[in-house]
Amino acid sequence: MNDDFIAAEELLQRGAAALSFPVNQEVIEKLMHYLQLLAKWNRVHNLTAIREPQQQVIVHLLDSLVVAPFLPPAQTIADIGSGAGLPGIVLAIVCPQQQFFLVESNTKKSVFLREAVRQLALENVKVVAMRAEQWRPEAKLNVLISRAVSDINSFLMWTAALGDENSRWLLMKAHDDEVCTQKDFYVENVLPLTVPLLDAARVLFVVKKKS
């Protein structure tokens, strides 16, 4: 591991210590393995715009980790528009008892996701290489999460068939001023998120289907 990644691991350990739940060294090492895989693939494929390891720790890893306390235990969770596996792979590493689906239609990104899942030995993760609106899982999902949502209402429309009134849609946003206009949904809560080492606002929209 070069100096950049050594410094990044130290930063991750510092940031993880500020989270509201414990993160052990085994998890830290697996997260750094993921970051090294991402760096390797980024040299050939443009998976993420942020390439500096310490910045990736803050904007990718810690920004994903802060939502872990809001995931219900022993549930099926789909990361919609997973991209390079954010937040899905990060959450799957810290929540090994939960089943994750990484839904990503972009071919180069879904290929990377499969390779990352293989190399990280994430037995609780499956990659779904298709658009969310085309996917029909065997059962309704308990949680649908995304940090790639530009418009909440379009996202809810595309993913409505994947959950029911017992499901939760967790949408990570920079601002809390969006309004849900989808008639079959309502916003149950808007939770402020504090990302360690990041001087920027983050909120989590918790959305449910009406009964």
Curated annotation (Swiss-Prot):
InterPro entries tied to this protein: rRNA_ssu_MeTfrase_G (IPR003682), SAM-dependent_MTases_sf (IPR029063)
Entry's Gene Ontology cellular component terms: cytosol
Domain of life: Bacteria
Signal peptide span: none
SUPFAM superfamilies: S-adenosyl-L-methionine-dependent methyltransferases
Top-rank EC class of the record's enzyme: transferase
Annotated function: Specifically methylates the N7 position of guanine in position 527 of 16S rRNA.
UniProt record similarity statement: Belongs to the methyltransferase superfamily. RNA methyltransferase RsmG family.
The protein's name in its UniProt record: Ribosomal RNA small subunit methyltransferase G
Species name: Dichelobacter nodosus (strain VCS1703A)
